[in-house]
Regions:
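Alpha-helix-loop-beta-strand connector modules within alpha/beta enzyme cores
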Residues: 1, 16-24, 70-93
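Catalytic cores of alpha/beta
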Residues: 36-47, 97-113
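Short, acidic/turn-prone active-site loops that include or flank metal/cofactor-
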Residues: 57-58, 118-123
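Hydrophobic faces of well-ordered beta-strands that scaffold small-molecule active sites
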Residues: 28-32, 52-54, 92-95, 113-117
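Alpha-helical scaffolding segments of alpha/beta enzyme cores, especially the outer helices
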Residues: 43, 76-83, 102, 106, ...
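Conserved anion-binding
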Residues: 1-48, 56-58
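Glycine-rich, proline-tolerant flexible connector loops at the mouths of alpha/beta enzymes
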Residues: 54-72
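C-terminal helical cap(s) of enzyme catalytic domains, especially alpha/beta-barrels
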Residues: 66, 108, 121-134
Length: 134
């Protein structure tokens, strides 16, 4: 708990109000990135959480095919996770690591509510190489 304006610079009453207000608004999201997460996704989603994110690289590695997302096994895993989430009426998220705008609509069509778009190092890498691409 820092000494910031949001917490009243450490003033006890404001700090308590801040904690209670924020605690009521906290949402919980699971990351499904392994065979264990895949196997237990129904149970995980029934635990009063708000949603989940698939980490595709870790999940594909757990399926013994790191970085490959177009296999039947990966697609079946993804469909199982999406279906379990929809049954529990929780938000579905996907971490789209490669910064490809065209993939956003495809993920939305699959039923994802939230898409974490790329990571800074991939965007910097691609942006830095762009002037040299012919």
């Amino acid at each position: 708990m820092g000494l910031a304006r949001a917490q009243g610079y450490g003033e006890n009453l404001q700090k308590q109000d801040y904690i209670l207000d924020k605690a009521a608004k906290i949402e919980i999201y699971a990351q499904i990135e392994s065979m264990k997460g895949l196997k237990n996704c129904k149970e995980i989603f029934s635990q009063n959480i708000n949603g989940y994110f698939i980490g595709p690289y870790d999940l594909s590695a757990s399926l013994n095919n790191p970085g490959v997302f177009d296999t039947d096994e990966f697609n079946e895993a993804e469909a199982k996770i999406l279906s379990a989430a929809k049954q529990e009426n929780i938000k579905c998220g996907y971490h789209l690591v490669e910064p490809e705008i065209s993939q956003i609509q495809l993920l939305q069509a699959k039923g994802y509510d939230m898409i974490a778009f790329s990571v800074d190092i991939r965007m910097l890498d691609i942006g830095a190489r762009l002037p040299f691409v012919k």
